[in-house]
Amino acid sequence: MEKFLKYEIKVNNEQARANPNYGIFEVGPLESGFVITIGNAMRRVLLSCIPGASVFALSISGAKQEFAAVEGMKEDVTEVVLNFKQLVVKISDLLFEDGEMVEPPLERWPLLTVTAEKAGPVYAKDLECPAGFEVVNKDLYLFSLQTDKKVTVNVYVKQGRGFVTFLENREMINSLGIIATDSNFSPVLHCGYEVQELKTSKQKITDHLTFKIATNGAISAVDAFAMAAKILIEHLNPIVNVNESIKALNIIQEKAEERRVRSFAKQIEELDFTVRTFNCLKRSGIHTLQELLSKSLADIREIRNLGKKSEREIIKKVHELGLKLRS
């Protein structure tokens, strides 16, 4: 079968070091049509399927429900809830197993807590986090106290994917005074791609794909890009595995330079020399094609017990491979 072009990924490492939350990834060359196939699939997965963490509920001392007002607090509870929904939190995979921070019993939930007693603003950096939790956007404004008064806010955070409404989150809550919120788990804020057509020859037109990805800091753009591809691959692998012969099929065309490097690494056993020629080469310390090509014709003629017939065989084999001995 005609093989598909092998493409490359270019990552702007300098830009990634300056701002890991934003990434530009160049993919190409791709055969015509594949830019839309890959671009759309990657974009959909990046925007909806990358796992993350989000606030799903909170409790405020002195407030029984979201339409209340708390004495001494500048904002009403609805405004405070909207501010807390913008929290970006990372949960360590090292401390929590898969699914552990999705639906544990509410009474055992690790809480992010802030207690304010003095008049003034309160920010995300003031939150006390349990082990394994980290607030990313520490400068996020949460609320202000207009007078000296003790107010405590407990924040419930869980892992998930996509978007979950407060109605769905409320089903987990069986306690008065805990206010459910909407949850946006996706750490990817923006993902777009651009297509550039490249004419590589009279008959061949290839496309170039450029992804631009921005995240909220809970995951780097590079990690999100790789994670999206991993999710797609894991979903497609079972389909490939339906047919073992197809599974083993190589459909991507190697570049000429890669084929050249791979052929150089061939053992001389793979070159189908006659026994006499093979033994002479082995005894002289030549084990790979690369070692053979490093020899000149004069070097070959000096190999002990190597006759004219074997010499001609070596020259012919090298020519068949489109190569030549050292001059």
From Swiss-Prot:
EC number(s) recorded for this UniProt protein: 2.7.7.6
GO term, biological process aspect, one: DNA-templated transcription
Catalytic activity: RNA(n) + a ribonucleoside 5'-triphosphate = RNA(n+1) + diphosphate
Annotated region described as Alpha N-terminal domain (alpha-NTD), given as residue ranges: 1-243
Stretch list, region Alpha C-terminal domain (alpha-CTD): 260-327
Cellular compartments per GO CC: cytoplasm; DNA-directed RNA polymerase complex
Quaternary assembly: Homodimer. The RNAP catalytic core consists of 2 alpha, 1 beta, 1 beta' and 1 omega subunit. When a sigma factor is associated with the core the holoenzyme is formed, which can initiate transcription.
Recorded domain comment: The N-terminal domain is essential for RNAP assembly and basal transcription, whereas the C-terminal domain is involved in interaction with transcriptional regulators and with upstream promoter elements.
Protein name: DNA-directed RNA polymerase subunit alpha
Gene: rpoA
